[in-house]
């Protein structure tokens, strides 16, 4: 039991005496059950953890440490609302407890309450400044909320509290990348790998810098790691994707493609995606918005918003960076607010989108538009207009323009083979479950293409395409047309987009810090291996 307490103390930043105080009031039998549950939770053995906690709850149903672990277990099982309620009960029994606050913040964040999560993490760090986990969670949440400099400071504090905190070094690297400090980001990832050479996320994050090139030594290290029989599957997947980048970088394309197929197949087994059901959803959206919504005379609602919609890896970050280089535009990146407003209305009505669209009144759309503008108001604090490039927003263009009639929508497009191949190379942090087989990628691209073609056809005054290849060939003319469509005066700074200093929180963060690159196409390297993809996309 002492060894277990010592392990927890080192992990959390709380000393052994504090851990002993946490168990005050528990019998030796209950303490044993709590320790067993805690170990099982750490190892993600939820059935075992619940069995141990059931015994502890029978002996001490209102003990705060027992309830804290129950809340953590609920979180691990994905029952976030129950986790929040349980952790609030624990906090009522032990007010001002930093560890409970830290756990509560994690569950609030998982349930979508980012403001509540930040408040909990901030209070935890105030009460226990040595608690590395609270600083880490604070930094991670600040990063998600686009408060990037604050995130950096919190993550640096987490590392000061716990120099061996590998995950903090990885997320710090992500934050530095967003701030344009690519070399510092690489050093942070490399330091994480010095601490744990098998940290798959650190390897993939290093690969995901895009502008950094691996060498033969990196490729050999990754090959050895990939062959390790005892590697955790998540690490094996991350290392697999990183190995693809290393093999590409040293010109071994046949091996790279084989590794790419294997890494994607492993990831696909862990996610759920139903392509036919998604296609039927797109059918329903097309039927719900057969024509453009009416624009009320003189309406300016939503004039501040420029939606940049696309599939991943299609030039949307580059397009946003060009717009954000304009003196009138703030680049807000991938905001969750449009789908959140739509999903909230669906819950209120008890009908999934787009099932309620036919009964929505002009007043309903205006209300939803005002809700969106209230949620995103901070993005106009310094500049009058902002971009929103949420990855699922292409599905909601009809709703967005009904809500915000003066908004503009830019549809980013890239060669479909290059788009799908680039997505296939990308291990996404979350979502994009369609991207782990070429067949499902092709089906998703076809759904994107038919819906976005519909938007531009029915509403060309408010929806326009931005083609990546045209931007590469004619950067000044294409940029000029983009600005004109958005109602912006031409500014030469938009041609020097790579000089903009905003935080960029996507996989292309390092690339948009450089001038336009014309060497991003890679399909030619793989030859006949992509024939089935080309057929599925209808490009052969």
Map each language-model feature to its residues:
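Phosphate-binding active sites in nucleotide-utilizing proteins
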Residues: 299-402, 408
């Amino acid at each position: 039991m002492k060894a277990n307490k010592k392990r927890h103390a080192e992990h959390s930043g709380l000393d052994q005496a504090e851990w002993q105080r946490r168990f005050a009031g528990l019998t030796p039998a209950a303490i044993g059950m709590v320790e067993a549950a805690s170990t099982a939770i750490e190892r993600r053995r939820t059935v075992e953890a619940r069995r141990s906690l059931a015994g502890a709850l029978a002996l001490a149903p209102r003990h705060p440490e027992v309830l804290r672990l129950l809340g953590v277990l609920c979180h691990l099982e994905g029952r976030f609302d129950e986790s929040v309620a349980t952790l609030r009960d624990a906090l009522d029994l032990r007010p001002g407890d930093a560890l409970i606050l830290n756990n509560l913040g994690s569950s609030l964040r998982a349930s979508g309450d980012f403001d509540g999560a930040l408040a909990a993490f901030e209070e935890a760090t105030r009460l226990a400044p040595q608690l590395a986990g609270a600083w880490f969670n604070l930094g991670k949440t600040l990063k998600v909320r686009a408060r990037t400099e604050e995130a950096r400071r919190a993550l640096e504090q987490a590392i000061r509290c716990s120099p061996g905190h590998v995950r903090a070094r990885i997320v710090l690297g992500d934050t530095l990348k967003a701030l344009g400090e690519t070399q510092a980001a690489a050093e942070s990832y490399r330091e994480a790998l010095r601490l744990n050479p098998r940290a798959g996320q650190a390897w993939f994050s290093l690969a995901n810098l895009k502008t950094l090139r691996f060498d033969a030594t990196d490729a050999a290290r990754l090959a050895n790691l990939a062959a390790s029989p005892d590697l955790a599957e998540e690490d094996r997947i991350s290392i697999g994707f990183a190995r693809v980048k290393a093999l590409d970088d040293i010109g071994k394309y046949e091996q790279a493609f084989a590794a790419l197929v294997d890494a994607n197949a492993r990831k696909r087994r862990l996610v759920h995606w139903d392509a036919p059901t998604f296609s039927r959803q797109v059918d329903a959206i097309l039927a719900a918005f057969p024509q453009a919504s009416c624009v009320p005379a003189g309406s300016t609602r939503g004039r501040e918003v420029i939606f940049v919609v696309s599939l991943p890896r299609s030039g949307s970050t580059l397009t946003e960076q060009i717009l954000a280089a304009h003196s009138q535009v703030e680049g807000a990146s991938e905001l969750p607010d449009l789908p959140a407003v739509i999903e909230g209305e669906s819950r209120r009505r008890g009908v999934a989108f787009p099932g309620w669209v036919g009964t929505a009144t002009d007043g309903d759309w205006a209300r939803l538009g005002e809700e969106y503008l209230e949620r995103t108001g901070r993005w106009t604090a310094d500049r009058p207009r902002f971009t929103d490039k949420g990855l699922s927003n292409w599905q909601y263009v009809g709703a967005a323009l009904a809500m915000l009639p003066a908004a503009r929508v830019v549809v980013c497009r890239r060669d479909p083979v290059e788009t799908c191949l680039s997505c296939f190379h990308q291990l996404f942090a979350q979502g994009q479950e369609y991207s782990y087989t070429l067949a499902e990628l092709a089906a998703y691209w076809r759904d994107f293409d038919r819906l976005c073609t519909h938007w531009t056809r029915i509403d060309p005054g408010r929806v326009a395409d931005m083609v990546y290849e045209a931007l590469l060939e004619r950067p000044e003319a294409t940029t000029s047309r983009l600005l004109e469509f958005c109602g912006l005066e031409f500014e030469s700074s938009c041609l020097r987009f790579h000089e903009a200093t905003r935080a960029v929180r996507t996989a292309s963060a390092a690339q948009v810090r450089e001038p336009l690159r014309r060497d991003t196409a890679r399909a030619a390297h793989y030859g006949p291996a992509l024939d089935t993809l080309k057929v599925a996309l209808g490009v052969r």
